[in-house]
C-alpha cells in the first residue's frame, strides 16, 4: 500500500508524467530491454552489485534451523528480515562458506558413476604422455570429429528413451527400448544409480554424455579419434604442435576402427563370391563387433569410409552424397556435367571406352594425407590447388586429379597394355585401369603433362614433374598451397542404390562407390570381430578353415545327418564347404570327391555301416565336383601349416583325431566339439567291421576256431582268417585285407557275398 501511495504522488507531479509520456521510443526500448523478461541482461554487473549487498542470497526458511545465526568469527550469516514478496530468508555469502565447511555430508558413492566421463578423462590425461613442442606451419583442415570420448553411440532418440527410463521411470510417456545396447545400458544404469542423491537433471545431462556421439566440425592436423580431439587445444596451435599419446582408449574409437576393418574384410571377400551383394548382406548380418551385431552398429555409426558406406548402401541406409575415386572423397562444389560415352586411344594404341563428363565443374578432394581444390572442364584440368603432408602425399593427389580430368595427354602417357583385374579376376573399368597404371608409373604422366611459368601468389608455390617445389615453374595448372582444404561439412545423407557387384549409384545414376575404392590396408582390430559366416573363415588362414568346417558339421550334425541320408546333393552343395576346397590340392579334388561320394553311397546301401566319425571326417571332401574314377585312397591330403598333411580315411591323425573315451574331436590339436554317435554304433552288427578291410571268403569253416565277436575281430593280423558272427546269428569266414586301399570294393562285394555265404 505504501508503494502504491508513493507512485500516486509521483504521478501527480507534472514532471513525472512528462518523462513517461514524452521520452522518445528508443529510450523506451532500452528501458524495456533491461526490465522485461526473466533473462538477466547484464549478469556481470548484476553479480557485482548483488554481492555488494549484505544479504544477496535468498533461502528457504528451514535454513534458520540448519545454520547458526553467527559464525565462529561472530559474523551474521542470515538476516531476520524476510525477502520482499516471498517468504524466504535473506542470507549472507558467508553462510555458503559455513555450509561447505560444516554442513551435512552425503554419500559420494554415486559421484564416480554419474560423472564417469569426467573421471575417465582425468585418468586418460594422467596416463597420457606429452612430448616436445615443435614449431612449424600447421596444415589444418576442418573435419567432422567426435568430441565425446567414451560414448555408447546411441542415436539421440534412443538415448532419450534410455535416460527417461533410468532417471524418470515414473514419468508418463511411451518409451521404446528395442536395441540390445539400449536394454543392456538401461539395466546396468538402473542398478548403478539406485538411491542416487545427485539431482536428476544432472544425472540426465551426464547420461547423455555417456550415450550419444557429439560431433563438431573442427580444424585438425593429426589424429581425429575422440581421445585426441579432447586435447586438441593442448596439441596444436596456429604455428606449433605438441606430441601426445593418449593414456587410454575408449570404446567408441575402438568400435569405429574395428567397424572399418570388418567392413573392408567383408567387401573384399564378397567381391570374389558368385553373388557379391547377397554374400555381403549374409556376412554383415552374421558378424559381431565387440559382442554387438554389426548391422546395429552400421545403423547408428556415422563413420564415412568406403567399405562401411558400401555395407550401409547394401542395407538400404542413406549415405553421404560425395563420391570416392582413388581413395579421395570428391564433393562437387559448383558447376554441372552430363555423361557421354567416348572411345579414346592410349599411347599403346589400346582402345578405352570411358564415360566423359562434359561441362565445367569444381570439386574439393579430401584424402587422409592430402587435400585439393580441382577445377575442370570437359577432358581438361583447369586448376588444381593441392596441399599435403609431404611430396609423396601431394603426388598421390596430383595423379588422382590428372586421371580424373580425363585429359588426352594423360591417356597418351600410358605405356604398355592396361589389364588390371580385381580380386575376382574381372577387368577393372577404364578409369581404374588408368589410375592403377599411373600409381605404378607416374613419371611418364608428370613428364608428358607439361609445365608453365608461374606468378608469385601469396601462400602458393609451383611443383615440378619430379615433385620438387619451385617458385618459377610448375606442372600446368597445378599449384601447392600451404592451406588445407576443409572436408565437406554437411551431414546430409542421400538415398542410393547398389547393384549385385556392389557398385553404389546416386539417384542420377552416377557411380559414387565401388569395391575398387576399398583400401587394401590391413589393420588389427581393437575389438574382437566374430565372423559367423563361413565365407570369412579364410580370414585367419587355412587352419581356421579346417577347424571351422568341422565345428560347423558338429554343431549342425542333426540336420546334416538327415540330409546325408536323404538329399546328399543338397548337402554337398552347401556354401559352408566352399572355403575347405582351397585346402585340397587342385589335382586331387575331383578324385577325392568321387571316392568319398561312392563310399557314402555304399554306407547308405548297406544296413549297419553308418559311421558318424567317418562321415564327418570325409564329408567336406565330397563337396567338389566329383570325377568318376576307380581310384582308392587310404588317406586324403590337405594343405595346412605350409605343407600337405594327411587325414586317414580310417583312423586318427594329427589333423583329425576322435577320442572315443571322451567323445570329443580335435582338429589340428584344437577342440572342435563333442560327437554323439548313434546308439549301438560300432557294435551294430558285424557288417560295419566286415565291410571295411575284410574280405568275405564264404560259409563258416570250423578249422578257424569258434566264431569271433566284432570286437575280437579287430585283433586279426593282415591276411589272417577267422569265423565271424554277423547280423542275425549267421557265421561267415572272413580274411583281413592285406592292403588298405581296397576298402571300396569290400563294401561293394560284401553285400553280395554275405547273401551268398548265408544262403
Swiss-Prot record:
Keywords associated with the record: Cap snatching, Eukaryotic host gene expression shutoff by virus, Eukaryotic host transcription shutoff by virus, Host gene expression shutoff by virus, Host nucleus, Host-virus interaction, Inhibition of host RNA polymerase II by virus, mRNA capping, mRNA processing, Viral transcription, Virion
Motif (Nuclear localization signal): 736-739
GO cellular component, one term: virion component
GO biological process: 7-methylguanosine mRNA capping; cap snatching; DNA-templated transcription; symbiont-mediated suppression of host gene expression; symbiont-mediated suppression of host mRNA transcription via inhibition of RNA polymerase II activity; viral RNA genome replication
Keyword Acetylation among UniProt keywords: no
Positions marked as site (Avian adaptation): 627
GO molecular function, one term: RNA binding
InterPro entries referenced in this protein's UniProt entry, alphabetically: Flu_PB2_2nd, Flu_PB2_6th, Flu_PB2_C, Flu_PB2_CAP-bd, Flu_PB2_middle, Flu_PB2_N, INV_PB2, PB2_helical
UniProt signal peptide: none
Compartments where located: Virion; Host nucleus
Subunit annotation: Influenza RNA polymerase is composed of three subunits: PB1, PB2 and PA. Interacts (via N-terminus) with PB1 (via C-terminus). Interacts with nucleoprotein NP (via N-terminus).
HAMAP family membership: INV_PB2
Function of the molecule: Plays an essential role in transcription initiation and cap-stealing mechanism, in which cellular capped pre-mRNAs are used to generate primers for viral transcription. Recognizes and binds the 7-methylguanosine-containing cap of the target pre-RNA which is subsequently cleaved after 10-13 nucleotides by the viral protein PA. Plays a role in the initiation of the viral genome replication and modulates the activity of the ribonucleoprotein (RNP) complex.
Family: Belongs to the influenza viruses PB2 family.
The name this protein goes by in its record: Polymerase basic protein 2
Source organism per UniProt: Influenza A virus (strain A/Fowl plague virus/Rostock/8/1934 H7N1)
